[in-house]
């Protein structure tokens, strides 16, 4: 267990610190999860089998466990809408699933090489853009669940969704210049 202790911490900063401690060739897959995540007993087997069948990037289905308040119910609904459209919907159309930052499995060698170039405040959207740019398809495992707890406070909800909106705009404006080239070269996922 590696404990990251930073004055100002971020998920990416912690992931980068962990990856710097791991040697290439030791592992096949990086699995990104949050500390509160719980998985089914066959979760790792399913992810490993999917990887072994040729998928280098995998997103599993995050489900919120506790829904004691209206805000947490809204949070769970929002996440299921995203699962339906941005993950299952994309895959049904032949496009890559969107990453959600939890229950995400990526080829170890690719991840270790690319994580070094990311900023400490980057998130899964930047990783997703890199995968798509390299035409690495993100598989979605709709029936492989990651159970997550969610802070149900209104302030936390609005902060998270404000960050999500900011990330969407950042991703749009960062990648919009690549749109014509992506379409012309047939990288429809990236477009």
Describe the predicted segments one by one.
Residues 121-127:
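Acidic donor-binding loop at a coil-to-helix junction in glycosyltransferase catalytic cores
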Residues 34-50:
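Acidic donor-binding/catalytic loop of UDP-sugar-dependent glycosyltransferases
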Residues 93-94, 152-191:
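Basic/Trp-rich segment in TM-proximal cytosolic loops or flexible interdomain/linker regions
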Residues 4-16, 22-27, 46-120, 162-173:
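Long helical/loop segments within the catalytic core of UDP-sugar-dependent glycosyltransferases
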Residues 14, 127-128:
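Short, hydrophobic alpha-helical packing/hinge segments within bilobed ligand-binding/sensory domains
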Residues 30:
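Short aromatic/hydrophobic "clamp" motif used to bind/position activated sugar donors
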Residues 128-146:
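Catalytic donor-sugar/metal-binding loop of nucleotide-sugar-dependent glycosyltransferases
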Residues 9, 37-39, 63-65, 126, ...:
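A short, conserved beta-strand element in the Rossmann-like catalytic core
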